[in-house]
Amino acid sequence: MQNLRHAASEAFQRLGLKQRHLGYEELGELDGVEKPQPHWFHTLQVRRLRVQRGRSNSDPMGGKSFQQEFQWKTGLQFGNATSYLNLEKLGEGTYATVYKGISRINGHLVALKVIHMKTEEGIPFTAIREASLLKGLKHANIVLLHDIIHTRESLTFVFEYVQTDLAQYMIQHPGGLHSYNIRLFMFQLLRGLSYIHGRRILHRDLKPQNLLISYLGELKLADFGLARSKSIPCQTYSAEVVTLWYRPPDVLMGSTDYSTALDIWGAGCIFIEMLQGSPAFPGVADVFEQLLKIWTVIGVPTEEIWPGVSDLPNYKPEWFLPCKPQQFRDVWKRLSQLPYKTEDLAQQMLMMNPKDRISAQDALLHPYFNTLPPPLMHLRDTVSIFKVPGVRLESEARDIFSPSRRTKTPLAPLAKCW
């Protein structure tokens, strides 16, 4: 296994890192110019940059004034660790730590995902997979990989900096989001899924923490560490994917022969969570309890309803009391306050049989989105929906991006390292 990891590490060094570093010119939409931001947002950034920071061995600003360290330099290049400064830690995960940083090349805020490598293990496979996939994905609703820095001690991915994630956004706006904002978020989520599914890529880890939200309301898919290309010669996949609450019943019952329907179920759960203000199927203990939550709503599957379900390893209908399918609006009360097409889309995304679930491309054409401006349906992949005149987020009951709101309740720290 160690030899295999070392071989993968060497291959990764040859994969795009050799004499080539991603520049902003290659990334399509940046052109070296920051997107316009509200004047108060710029002020907020400046104030945060002025905060005194203590010295740290891992802090590149330790021992020097900010004015000395933070300056644009013409000689700096992409792929160089000295081209970026850490500002603050955003989160920590299983194999990586994410920092908010700034580029000394052009002054752009960035997110630095630092993966510390153990000599005997080399680069984690999840990092190799994430980098290889993201280098080929250029879409407005997928987090942008700017640069890759590879040293003996660490591997750093330099991403565009996005202000928060959907989990934190929902925490700041309890009780469900504005119905129009949900429509915009769902359109962007499905747009991103349609893009990767069209390239035979499954995300496999959809959850609110992995959906980044900018101050404009741009939603971006992040954390492709579990993503996998279906073009890789492999007939089955691991069943240990997707956080339990967003895992579809076929995977919970042990299926390893899944497709894009896996991501659609997760997106459907997120849809309900944005509407309701709480998770759709909040299991606590284990797979059994998670299945019980699902069967209570959509019923226990049978061969008549779902041909082949009895062949799944964890299909144990005798463990559950017979349950009949319920109307979604009876389970999630907010649906009863909205047009039927909202419930219809949710039902098509949360179908029991994965073969019956709607595709991301078809979901974008669902009547639920008919009230959005028609030009949204014809945008280039790299163009944000907020480039269309009149498309903007509505104010939530508690608007985290308004100046007055920020003075009362600071944005909660990121709970997940993506």
UniProtKB/Swiss-Prot annotation:
Q: Name one GO biological process term.
A: regulation of cell cycle phase transition
List the active-site residues. Answer: D205 (proton acceptor)
Q: Name one GO molecular function term.
A: metal ion binding
Q: Write down the superkingdom of origin.
A: Eukaryota
Keyword ATP-binding among UniProt keywords: yes
Question: Which residue ranges does the record assign to the Protein kinase domain?
Answer: 84-369
Report residues binding ATP: L90, G91, E92, G93, T94, Y95, A96, T97, V98, K113
What this protein catalyses is:
L-seryl-[protein] + ATP = O-phospho-L-seryl-[protein] + ADP + H(+); L-threonyl-[protein] + ATP = O-phospho-L-threonyl-[protein] + ADP + H(+)
One Pfam family hit: Pkinase
EC number of the protein = 2.7.11.22
Q: Which GO terms describe its cellular component?
A: cytoplasm; cytosol; nucleus
Gene3D superfamilies on file: Phosphorylase Kinase, domain 1, Transferase(Phosphotransferase) domain 1
Q: What does this protein do?
A: Serine/threonine-protein kinase involved in the control of the eukaryotic cell cycle, whose activity is controlled by an associated cyclin.
**Family in the record:** Belongs to the protein kinase superfamily. CMGC Ser/Thr protein kinase family. CDC2/CDKX subfamily.
Instruction: Name the chain's protein.
Output: Cyclin-dependent kinase 15
What species is this protein from? Answer: Danio rerio
